[in-house]
Amino acid sequence: MSTPVIPDKFLDLFTKKAFAHLATLMSGGEPQVTPVWIDYDGERVIFNTAVGRQKDKNLQRDARVSLSIADPDNPYRYLEVRGRVSERTTSGADAHIDKMAKKYLDKDKYPFRQPGEVRVIFKVTPEHVTSAG
């Protein structure tokens, strides 16, 4: 099965300051939704969190996700990506969160780091892509 492609006309959502709403599953099956900063490597949607947060725990147990990304300039234009985490790594996660801080906050360093916090990157391989607008 081939990986669904993000339509070219929606790739700008990954360069704008668009937040994704990330849905993961709790151990009892309830959905848990969190806004996250997003990135795209041409094949996978990427987000970053701290080890031990609820989304990290959920994704270590169940790799399925859904992301909804609305255009900040036109909320009726959006992208939905359903898929699975294909990679979880701490390698490069500090540099990546700083890159995201530059994009979203215009700060060179992520300003909300907590003492002892370990950052982790998740890469999501799309299995279903829907768009509108």
Show which residues each predicted segment covers.
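Extreme N-terminal tail/first-helix region
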Residues: 1-20
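Short secondary-structure boundary segments
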Residues: 50, 71-72, 126-127
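A generic structural signal for nonpolar/aromatic side chains embedded in well-ordered alpha-helices
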Residues: 13-14, 59, 100, 124
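A short, polar/proline- and glycine-enriched secondary-structure boundary/capping micro-motif
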Residues: 56-62, 78, 106
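Charged, gly/pro-rich active-site loop segments
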Residues: 1-5, 77-133
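A short beta-turn/loop motif at secondary-structure boundaries
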Residues: 28-30, 71-75, 114-116
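Short beta-strand segments
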Residues: 18-51, 59, 65-69, 80
